[in-house]
From Swiss-Prot:
Domain of life of the source: Eukaryota
Protein name: Phosphatidate phosphatase LPIN3
Alphabetized Gene3D superfamilies for the sequence: HAD superfamily/HAD-like
Function: Magnesium-dependent phosphatidate phosphatase enzyme which catalyzes the conversion of phosphatidic acid to diacylglycerol during triglyceride, phosphatidylcholine and phosphatidylethanolamine biosynthesis therefore regulates fatty acid metabolism.
Family: Belongs to the lipin family.
Chain intervals for the UniProt region annotation (N-LIP): 1-108
Short sequence motif DXDXT motif: positions: 640-644
Swiss-Prot/TrEMBL catalytic activity: a 1,2-diacyl-sn-glycero-3-phosphate + H2O = a 1,2-diacyl-sn-glycerol + phosphate
Organism: Mus spretus (Western Mediterranean mouse)
Biological process according to GO: cellular response to insulin stimulus; fatty acid catabolic process; positive regulation of transcription by RNA polymerase II; triglyceride biosynthetic process
Length: 847
């Protein structure tokens, strides 16, 4: 029994360690890279597929991947994306065509001086030569500790007054002062938020989005409303060989489509309430005034349908309790209703919470579930409401506060005098004035003054006479007291005019980064400078007066001591002269150019490469791979792993990890003999990228009579573990990845010659993939779990790896290196050209 217990403990420990290595939250891996030296001395390479896990604590300034080749660091860095993928950043030329938005990125953060703002805040701008910058030393904010009694009180009263506190927030939505909002923004957001960095947004967008928080990753963007299943989360990320990951459009399940169609059909049917039912139970009759629901746009409002849909949702026998996630989102987002209405089956509450605002009428009062927000309101009740109730039904931003709000001043009219005239006035005046001017100056290092903007103002007559002024580089568009060029302002105006929605903050920031001219001498953090021009002084005075009127306060960082700030003087390197209107654009890339590869100083054959990310909390996370340098005239043999080297697909993953040898007999010696004849081996498997270390360790562990498998690049699927298993086990389509991968490798050698000489597999899918890359059937071999080797040209003939090793010289003749005795034109040799032709023989006459 002791032996059985020890064996069970060993198996359990091995499986536990294996699971830790395959956990999607900690999964990291790198696929080997193949570099091919061309005939002319240039280089081509396969994509650098590297993926890191454990990205929960990474910030923008830490998303830099360092690279070491053969133990030496190289002057080449990668950047991390939202899903953990690493990529290179390349600057586009001005004449290069536009790239898709998902491939655009910010430059790799620059590890600047310690103690100063990070690279993403500084960007790529520099000060002119000889400029002396004076500033204050950076002070660390002292965090106020929370009092212990506050924690005790909040924890003791949380369960008793949880619902009442939320309803109190709904009942009294008093706007906070700007200083309080700034304090909340500062406390709720980290300090190292960088603009234009992947996976993050500005503090304004993060804070003001309410329950519609901006996602940090692409998978989170698509799967926020779905159940957090690892398989479902990974299946919506599309990972393709040679390309960066992107969000795949999730197919809507058939059951949800049926439910939605049933709900629409039920809501469309008219239903007359029974005479005995009260208005609070039967809903609103058809003769009653239209009901205005909070958070719903008036132009998309249908009174009868909305009222009946609510009644159906509450009284339906199919009602089911809400999930905790839904309740949490509804309770948080009650103050800010979402832009779109979603169907949910809820159970009616048996009591009305105290403090819930209700609108009374002669026929009775309307009651709603506490999770459905405030009750409905009639249009003829609007003149009698106070500002607090109006704020519930007319929120400041109906599209989510993450968008840029143009109409903040005009929305205040609803709170001051909520009547129908002001509602119509605010609807028409929902957008501030958009002013045009030909003053220019967007690329200058000082702001545009009001006098200069007004002096070159564009009127309606000017635009009608000369519409071409929109292409004028001096055109400045003023929206919400901010200045933009036409390339940035046009999408903003078009979005508001066509869709009645503002562009998200991240989109506007991206447009500013790509389309706005970079300011010549502006430093991104506000240090003091001397000798301001008069125009700049006036603009600063105007800004200060405006901020004072609006009640904004500049946040003052509390210092550790009372010593006055001492100035810091920096000598900034000179900025190379460039065109003021040019803004560099950066794109993501997985491949290196020939010049970049040449700078790596690769050795012939295998080169060990280490990708590392250093974080503040996790230390250094490393990912290892190998870069193989081959020549354009090498001959390559392709080999599958699961079922070809191992005896079966499923057990080939598990048994080798438990120490069991599960390889075919004779395959190691056969591959070794083929390698001695001058052939290169390429291992191609549909395993996931996270299993790269595990797969490489297994191939190095395989040994037979002291002979191991030849070294070669191990090409795996760049997708996640669950996606790879789903494609290989459930869909049974591993050839989708193999065709794309092998075709890409083939392009590295072409148009010189066909690189592939033979291939080994175990499935018809492998045969299909090998045929797609031009391999003849005479050199395609498949093996079954019994170890029987079949040549696709003669399927009836069965052999083994041992027998094929005996005739390896015939099927895999030695590769001749260097000069050979072959003639350039054999048809002009003495034997072929000077000999007499053979006499014609009539075979029919002989028959």
């Amino acid at each position: 029994m002791n032996y059985v217990g020890q064996l069970a403990e060993t198996v359990f420990g091995t499986v536990k360690e294996l699971y830790r290595g395959l956990n999607p939250a900690t999964l990291s891996g790198g696929i080997d890279v193949l570099v091919v030296r061309q005939r002319d001395g240039s280089f081509r390479c396969s994509p650098f597929h590297v993926r890191f896990g454990k990205l929960g604590v990474l910030r923008s300034r830490e998303k830099v991947v360092d690279i070491e080749i053969n133990g030496e660091p190289v002057d080449l860095h990668m950047k991390l994306g939202d899903s953990g993928e690493a990529f290179f950043v390349q600057e586009l030329d001005s004449d290069e065509e536009d790239v898709p938005p998902r491939l655009c990125t910010s430059p790799i953060p620059w590890g600047g001086l310690s103690g100063f703002p990070s690279d993403s805040q500084i960007g790529t701008a520099s000060e002119p030569e000889g400029l002396v910058i004076t500033g204050r030393r950076k002070r660390r904010r002292r965090r106020k500790p929370r009092r212990k009694e506050d924690v005790v009180d909040s924890s003791s009263e949380e369960l008793e007054a949880g619902v009442e506190s939320e309803l109190t927030l709904l009942e009294k939505p008093t706007p906070e002062s700007p200083s309080a909002q700034e304090e909340e923004e500062t406390s709720s957001q980290p300090k190292d938020i960088h603009p234009y960095s992947d996976g993050e947004c500005t503090p304004q967008a993060n804070l003001s989005s309410g329950d519609l928080m901006s996602p940090k990753s692409d998978s989170e963007l698509e799967l926020r409303s779905l159940e957090p299943s690892p398989l479902r989360a990974e299946s919506h990320m599309q990972w393709v060989w040679g390309r960066l990951p992107k969000v795949a459009k999730a197919e809507r399940p058939e059951f949800s489509l049926i439910l939605e169609s049933m709900a629409e059909a039920i809501c469309a049917l008219p239903e007359e309430p029974s005479p005995s039912s009260s208005p609070s139970e039967a809903g609103v009759d058809t003769l009653s005034p239209p009901v205005l629901h909070p958070g719903v746009r008036a132009d998309k409002f249908h009174p009868a349908v909305e009222a009946h849909c609510e009644e159906t949702a509450v009284d339906s026998p199919l009602a089911a309790p809400e999930s905790k996630e839904t309740k949490t989102q509804n309770s948080r987002g009650a103050g800010h209703p979402p832009a779109t209405k979603s169907w949910s089956w809820t159970t009616p509450e048996s009591h009305t919470p105290s403090g819930h605002p209700q609108v009374s009428r002669g026929k009775g009062s309307l009651k709603r579930n506490q999770h459905l927000g405030p009750s409905d309101i009639y249009l003829d009740d609007l003149p009698s409401l106070d500002s607090e109730n109006v704020a519930l039904y007319f929120p400041k931003s109906e599209y989510g506060m993450g968008a840029r709000r143009w109409s903040e001043p005009s929305n205040q009219k609803l709170l001051e005098s909520p009547n129908l005239e002001h509602i119509a006035e605010c609807t028409l005046d929902s957008v501030d004035k958009i002013e045009l001017s030909l003053c220019g100056g967007l690329a200058d290092n000082r702001d545009i003054s009001l006098e200069k903007f007004t002096q070159h103002m564009v009127s309606y007559e000017d635009l009608t006479k000369n519409p071409g002024l929109l292409d004028d580089p001096n055109l400045v568009v003023k929206i919400n007291e901010k200045h933009y060029n036409w390339a940035v302002a046009a999408p903003m105006i078009l979005s508001m005019q066509a869709f009645q929605k503002n562009l998200p903050e991240s989109t506007v920031d991206k447009l500013e980064k790509e389309k706005m001219p970079r300011k010549g001498g502006r430093w991104w953090f506000s240090w003091r400078r001397k000798d301001f021009p008069a125009e700049e002084h006036s603009s600063q005075r105007e800004k200060a007066a405006t901020r004072k009127q609006q009640g904004e306060k500049t946040e003052v960082l509390s210092s550790d001591d009372d010593v006055p700030d001492s100035p810091v003087i920096l000598e900034v390197p000179p900025l190379p002269s460039s065109t003021p209107g040019y803004v560099p654009t950066y794109k993501k890339s997985l491949r290196l150019s020939s010049d970049q590869i040449r700078c790596l100083n690769l050795n012939e054959g295998a080169n060990d490469v280490v990708f590392s990310v250093t974080t503040q909390y996790q230390g250094t996370c490393r990912c290892k791979a190998t870069i193989y340098l081959w020549n354009w005239d090498d001959k390559v043999v392709i080999s599958d792993i699961d079922g070809t080297i191992t005896k079966s697909d499923a057990l080939g993953h598990i048994l080798p990890q438990l120490g069991k040898d599960w390889t075919h007999q004779g395959i190691t010696s056969l591959y070794h003999k083929i390698h001695l004849n001058g052939y290169k081996f390429l291992y191609c498997s549909a395993r996931a990228i996270g299993m790269a270390d595990l797969t490489k360790g297994y191939l190095q562990w395989v040994s037979e009579h002291g002979c191991g498998l030849p070294k070669g690049p191990i090409l795996l699927s760049p997708s996640s573990l669950f996606s790879a298993l789903h494609r290989e086990v459930i869909e049974k389509k591993p050839e989708v990845f193999k065709v794309a991968c092998l075709s890409d490798i083939q392009q590295l050698f072409l148009p010189q010659r066909q690189p592939f000489h033979a291939a080994f597999g175990n499935r018809p899918n492998d045969v299909f993939a090998y045929r797609q890359v031009g391999l003849p059937e005479s050199r395609i071999f498949t093996v079954n779990p019994r170890g029987e080797l079949i040549q696709e040209l003669i399927k009836s003939h069965k052999s083994t790896y041992q027998r094929l090793g005996e005739v390896v010289e015939l099927l895999f003749p030695p590769v001749v290196r260097g000069p050979s005795t072959d003639l350039a034109s054999p048809e002009y040799s003495n034997l072929s050209y000077w000999r007499k032709p053979l006499p014609y023989v009539d075979f029919e006459a002989l028959a």
